[in-house]
């Protein structure tokens, strides 16, 4: 494991399309390995096996994306280092609940991260500056294909990709954009958009909590399971 250095977020240091409103675009994939229990039901040996399997695939992930990756074992980090990763939204607080055999794989520009053994065996997250879902989507699918070339992924012909949380069942995909919306907050119009968003299959939430801090909001899809 490399020595910890504070990750520099490439999507924050460059300007993308519609950057005056759209700060970043994100795609996340949830995946699990076949015939292994979800992390919340797995024992120490299961979690250690999953961690080692994914570490071995880093060269394949690098080849698929053209990026250089490092990995961090969460239980080997100091409390401060762990909090830096949380504050930069590179890991979830839940990953710290029981850090043993938990892993973060991240590209050197931090545009791609993979949490290992959080809710699911794999949480692949890809970011891009501005309004650009195509770039992170292509990276996420490339990583997904690279992993599936070596490991069997939990998949059901009717239900799709199997996930720990039913809300991710199906595609396991969440696409979101990070928006700066001060005018809607000041004119008190945001609540109207929030109220109709479920009708569009979308969810809107404040990026920093409940008090509209920074007037920054995340909009993502609610539906991951297909229907006829």
Provide a role label for each language-model segment.
Residues 1-158, 173, 187, 191-194, ...:
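Long, Pro/Ser/Thr-rich low-complexity/intrinsically disordered regulatory tracts in eukaryotic proteins
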Residues 160-177:
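Conserved phosphate/anionic-ligand binding catalytic regions in large, soluble enzymes, centered on
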């Amino acid at each position: 494991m490399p020595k910890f250095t504070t990750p520099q977020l490439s999507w924050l240091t460059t300007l993308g399309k519609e950057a005056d409103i759209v700060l970043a675009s994100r795609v996340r994939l949830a995946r699990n390995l076949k015939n292994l229990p979800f992390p919340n039901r797995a024992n120490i040996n299961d979690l250690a096996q999953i961690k080692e399997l994914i570490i071995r695939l880093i060269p394949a992930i690098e080849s698929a994306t053209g990026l250089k990756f490092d990995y961090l074992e969460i239980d080997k980090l100091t409390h401060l280092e762990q909090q830096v990763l949380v504050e930069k939204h590179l890991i979830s607080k839940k990953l710290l609940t029981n850090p043993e055999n938990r892993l973060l794989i991240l590209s050197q520009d931090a545009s791609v991260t993979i949490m290992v053994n959080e809710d699911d065996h794999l949480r692949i997250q890809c970011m891009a500056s501005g309004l650009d879902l195509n770039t992170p989507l292509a990276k996420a699918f490339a990583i997904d294909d690279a992993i599936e070339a070596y490991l069997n992924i939990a998949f059901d012909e009717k239900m799709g990709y199997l996930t720990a949380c039913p809300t991710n069942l199906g595609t396991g995909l969440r696409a979101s954009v990070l928006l700066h919306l001060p005018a809607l907050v000041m004119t008190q119009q945001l609540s109207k958009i929030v109220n109709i968003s479920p009708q569009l299959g979308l969810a809107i939430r404040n990026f920093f909590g409940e008090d509209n801090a920074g007037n920054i909001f995340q909009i993502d899809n609610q539906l991951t399971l297909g229907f006829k």
